UniProtKB/Swiss-Prot annotation:
GO terms for cellular component: nucleoplasm; nucleus. A zinc finger (C2H2-type) spans 258-280, 286-308, 314-336, 342-364. This is Zinc finger protein 281. Residues 377-396, 645-658, 775-813 have a biased composition (Polar residues). Coiled coil: none annotated. One of its GO terms (molecular function) is RNA polymerase II cis-regulatory region sequence-specific DNA binding. The lineage of its organism: Eukaryota, Metazoa, Chordata, Craniata, Vertebrata. There is a cross-link at residues 2, 100, 127, 211, 217, 223, 230, 240, 256, 298, 322, 370, 406, 413, 457, 474, 490, 495, 536, 596, 614, 619, 658, 667, 784, 789, 793, 816, 838 (Glycyl lysine isopeptide (Lys-Gly) (interchain with G-Cter in SUMO2)). The modification Phosphoserine is found at residues 392, 481, 648, 782, 805. Belongs to the krueppel C2H2-type zinc-finger protein family. The gene is Znf281.
């Protein structure tokens, strides 16, 4: 018997190559040569029906009934068998073969399927019964042999469609070349059929088959004992063996013929499959007696029980750590040795743990291969697997089965990832997971297939796109410039199909930095490390959804838009963009979330570090203390502070970055004041406050006996929540000015100060407030300040901070010609840094100058007005719990 070449070349359909004898429809052209006329394969017969149960050796003889007669019961092929020309008598069919068609699937429904799923479905729909006549076994033995050895053992004659001619000496090479061609044209399941049927040929002049082949096959037949044992074992409902028993004996022991219906995992035996199915069914036969946990295997339960018994038999010989499992100990030892035995084949990275390698592979190698395969569904994956099956001459069936199971598993994973949209991007931003539904397969597929390496090399770590908010989405597409625009548009739509792994999946950690100047977004930083630090610190900062002018977009997803917007610093001079700083996020946090108790220390410290390089060369010009109040112009559109009323045009103006800082803080102060429902601290008459760029690195703790001098009064603010990190800030970024009229000035001279943590300040503040709770008017005595001074002396040796009095002039320029009648209210800082102040309670704060040059501060308030953070003015000289002793007795009124 012989299978016609139409099955090979046509792939179960019409003849692909045409010509005489090349397709299933050309049997009459080649059938006039004698009694050995070939029975040709029915063109509509489904390719994947060449499957065998383990009770029967494989059969490769599928014949067409003669004339218009009904199919004989020995070969019932349902509707797929049609009448052949009457002039073509078929060879005698296998009398022992009966195909039972299950009603679940129709054989005619599968011919066009080209995926491995069709392979499985058609496999489910066919059952074969055991042969009744043992006399037919030798011929089947020979056919069976050709399934495995026909390619390489001696294929006699190839049909003209195979291009083989009459000579059998070219058979192996011709078959291999043919299979290479078909590997590029047909899906994976064809390779199995091609390989199975390619060698089973009889010569043109008869049906006699070489006896040595039959002898070889008999030598390869399994022992009847093993066959009987396996025949007794009932296959699981989930088990659909891919091979027969006879084939299984020939194949290598590493084969996994048992496939799980749930996840397409392959197993060597039905026991392993049944044990695996428990994972899907949720059954846990082994229950722990001490907790509610259950396990599918006994050894897992025994290992778990060691947790309850606290038994850790495996200890590290280099440290004191012990482990329940030996594997955990060995894995731990690699942390001492630095060994990284696990290598990613795609990017050549090494890993010390398999779980890290697997996590990396999800974003690296297999994802890229999967993307390339899905770009060209018919050729890429199956082509590689087909060539693999052909070239592995040692165990072709094993390689075929492995490749099939891999293709099933990979395809299943593709479906899952397509549904859940879960993919991650590694730090080096590898391209990943091109969609199954990629539009314009021919163009985009070729681009993806050929240029992935180049694409990876060209992909930048960060893309900065200038433009308005509506263009923010398009900036993400710059990651995939080699791809056509259709890909980008589809991925922007957020569909699970047309997704680039970078664009349309939830957990992408791309950070797109978009800074807006006057409402427009532009680049703010090219420093990737700063961006990552900011993304770590954003856990402190809830999302500020509405910020008018400045935003830093930390995008997790285009569709998700997990954006942290913050009042960024406007870069007025476009020479060098500012690095990404946390002050912008801090401003947005203060502005949008007034109910937060304070700002994290890390955020404040990063602000201080950002503006630590200010000039100290500018001169002092005090403001008059007794002048009436003039509001500061804080329009968001101004690029500088308005100077016509409160700035001196004759003095040196601050640099652009300082001006932009002043502008931002002034704008924030004004907005906070307008939104404030809590009356904060109103400074006394003539007290002027200049907008803070950022809180001081520490409390401005003034050294003893030098607090009051005749220099202009400059008092830098120290915030109650200050950074615990050491800072080398040479001076306070902003200060507070007092007028020159009383002749009493406060000067911050150079001193060494130890920074105090916010918790220490808060504790001291609460303690002092509790002590003062019984009296509405209280006085912070000099005795307390003395004790605080002693503490300060002990702390003076740690960190040095210089607080020059020239700082003020670097922030604002007072007028020399006319004395501005300006005061600044600081209610907004009460709102910004401590929204816990009760609404409606105004805490007036005034500085009263005594005749002897002392400043008397009193605060008439109760502790109920405070909720944990002192007012900003308490840091002008010292807070209620200040750690500096001043030579005068001061209290707050």
């Amino acid at each position: 018997m012989k299978i016609g070449s139409g099955f090979l070349s046509g792939g179960g359909g019409p003849s692909s190559s045409g010509g005489s004898g090349s397709g299933g429809s050309s049997g009459s052209a080649s059938g006039g040569s004698g009694g050995g006329r070939r029975a040709e394969m029915e063109p509509t017969f489904p390719q994947s029906m060449v499957m065998f149960n383990h009770r029967l050796p494989p059969v490769t003889s599928f014949t067409r009934p003669a004339g218009t007669a009904a199919p004989p019961p020995q070969c019932v092929l349902s509707s797929s068998t049609s009448a052949a020309p009457a002039a073509e008598p078929p060879p005698p069919p296998a009398p022992d073969m009966t195909f039972k068609k299950e009603p679940a699937a129709s054989a005619a429904a599968f011919p066009s399927q080209r995926t491995s799923w069709g392979f499985l479905q058609s496999l489910v729909s066919i059952k074969q019964e055991k042969p009744a006549d043992p006399e037919e076994q030798p011929s089947h033995h020979h056919h069976h042999h050709h399934h495995y050895g026909g390619l390489f053992a001696g294929a006699e004659e190839r049909s003209p469609g195979l291009g083989g001619g009459e000579g059998g000496s070219h058979g192996v090479i011709q078959d291999l070349s043919l299979l290479h061609q078909h590997a590029q044209q047909q899906p994976a399941q064809h390779h199995r059929d091609v390989l199975l049927s390619s060698g089973s040929r009889t010569d043109e002049h008869g049906n006699q088959e070489p006896k040595q082949d039959a002898n070889v096959k008999k030598a390869k037949r399994p022992k009847p004992e093993s066959q009987g044992i396996k025949a007794k074992r009932k296959p699981s409902a989930s088990s659909k063996p891919l091979v027969g028993e006879g084939e299984g004996a020939v194949l290598s022991p590493s084969q996994k013929p048992h496939i799980c219906d749930h996840c397409s995992a392959a197993f060597r035996s039905s026991y392993h499959l049944r044990r695996h199915v428990l994972i899907h069914t949720g059954e846990r036969p082994f229950q722990c007696s001490q907790c509610s946990m259950g396990f599918i295997q006994k050894y897992l339960l025994q290992r778990h029980e060691k947790i309850h018994s606290r038994e850790k038999p495996f200890g590290c010989d280099q440290c004191s750590m012990k482990f329940i499992q030996k594997y955990h100990m060995e894995r731990h030892k690699r942390t001492h040795s630095g060994e990284k035995p696990y290598k990613c084949d795609t990017c050549q990275q090494y890993f010390s743990r398999t779980d890290r390698l697997l996590k990396h592979r999800r974003t690296c190698g297999e994802a890229i291969a999967k993307g390339a395969a899905s770009a060209e569904p018919g050729s890429s994956n199956h082509n590689s697997m087909g060539n693999l099956a052909v070239l592995s001459q040692g165990n072709t069936s094993s390689s075929r089965r492995k490749s099939k199971s891999k293709s099933i598993a990979i395809e299943n994973k593709e479906h899952k990832t397509g549904k859940t949209n879960e993919s991650q991007m590694s730090n080096n931003i590898n391209m990943q997971s091109y969609s199954v539904e990629m539009p314009t397969v021919s163009t985009s597929g070729s681009i993806i297939g050929t240029g992935i390496d180049e694409l990876q090399k060209r992909v930048p770590k960060l893309i900065f796109k200038k433009g308005s908010r509506k263009n923010a989405d398009k900036s993400y597409l710059n990651f995939v410039s080699p791809l056509p625009d259709v890909v980008g548009q589809k991925s922007l739509s957020g569909k699970p199909g047309g997704s680039l792994g970078i664009v349309s999946n939830n957990s992408v950690e791309t950070i797109s930095l978009l800074q807006s100047t006057s409402g427009k977004q532009g680049p703010i930083s090219s420093n990737y490390d700063d961006a990552m630090q900011f993304s770590k610190k954003r856990r402190y900062l809830p999302t500020a959804s509405s910020n008018s002018a400045f935003s830093i977009n930390v995008g997790h997803m285009v569709s998700q838009q997990s954006v942290i917007q913050s009042a960024g610093v406007s870069v007025l001079d476009n020479e060098a963009p500012l690095s990404l700083i946390d002050s912008s996020a801090l401003n947005a946090e203060i502005k949008s979330c007034h109910d937060k108790s304070g700002i994290p220390d890390e955020v404040l410290q990063s602000i201080l570090d950002q503006y630590s390089g200010k000039s100290e060369t500018q001169k002092e010009d005090p403001f008059n203390l007794t002048e009436p109040r003039v509001d500061l112009h804080t329009s968001g559109e101004h690029s500088e502070l308005v100077q016509e009323e409160n700035l001196s045009p004759g003095t040196q103006t601050p640099s652009n970055d300082k001006t932009s800082m002043l502008q931002e803080y002034s704008k924030y102060l004004q907005q906070a004041f307008e939104k404030s429902t809590n009356a904060g601290f109103t400074l006394g008459h003539g007290f002027q406050f200049v907008s803070l760029s950022s809180p001081l690195h520490n409390h401005t703790l003034f050294p003893e006996k030098q607090i009051y001098t005749t220099s202009p009064l400059e008092c830098g603010f120290g915030q109650s929540v200050t950074s615990v990190l050491p800072s080398s800030l040479p001076k306070p970024p902003f200060g507070m000015l007092f007028g020159s009229q009383p002749g009493l000035y406060l000067s911050a001279l150079d001193a060494t100060h130890q920074q105090l943590t916010p918790s220490q300040e808060l504790d001291d503040l609460i303690d002092s407030q509790k002590n003062l709770e019984t009296s509405s008017a209280f006085q912070s005595s000099s005795q307390k300040l003395t004790s605080q001074k002693e503490q300060q002396k002990n702390l003076e040796s740690s960190t040095s901070f210089q607080i020059p009095s020239q700082e003020l002039a670097s922030q604002i320029d007072p007028q020399k010609d006319i004395e501005p009648r300006t005061t600044y209210q600081i209610e907004n800082f009460a709102q910004a840094f401590g929204s816990q102040f009760k609404s409606g309670s105004r805490v007036p704060m005034t500085f009263i100058t005594n005749s002897n040059g002392e400043v008397d501060h009193r605060v008439r308030t109760s502790v109920s007005d405070f909720s944990g953070y002192t007012n900003m003015m308490s840091d002008v000289s010292e807070p209620c719990s200040t750690r500096v002793k001043t030579p005068t007795s001061q209290s707050y009124r």
